[in-house]
């Protein structure tokens, strides 16, 4: 159980994102947050895309940033005192599955949080084009995060 009410978690994390230079520049929004789970979105914008071959495809570094951020926040949300605690990425793996041309949505789930290290798995999708279509998975990742507890 985390140290804050689940109803307030998304608003609290959104405030953190809004105060973070890079994350606010990217337009990151918190769609869902709970104990050990996180859903973040980055809206599509041409300033975040590749030029030349593949023009219009979201740059892979944007997906990697989203994977890193969602994983770290998911691990932090699983801690007894998530507001007082902190995490730092110690290992990040990203596998790109296909080009992304649209908003990116990351779903992160904690695999395990130990006394000093937490691990999360993250999937990044682009939303479906139509109501009857499925979202398209564009990248997957796994992050290991050093945990700095205050409990």
Swiss-Prot record:
Enzyme class of the recorded protein, top EC level: hydrolase
Keyword Hydrolase appears in the UniProt entry: yes
InterPro entries associated with the record: HotDog_dom_sf, PAAI_dom, Thioestr_dom
Keyword terms, alphabetized: Hydrolase
Keyword Cell division: no
Top-level taxon: Archaea
A GO MF label: hydrolase activity
One Pfam family of this chain: 4HBT
CDD domains for this protein: PaaI_thioesterase
EC number: 3.1.2.-
SUPFAM superfamilies, per database record: Thioesterase/thiol ester dehydrase-isomerase
Protein family (similarity comment): Belongs to the thioesterase PaaI family.
Listed name of the protein: Putative esterase VNG_1336C
Organism expressing this protein natively: Halobacterium salinarum (strain ATCC 700922 / JCM 11081 / NRC-1)
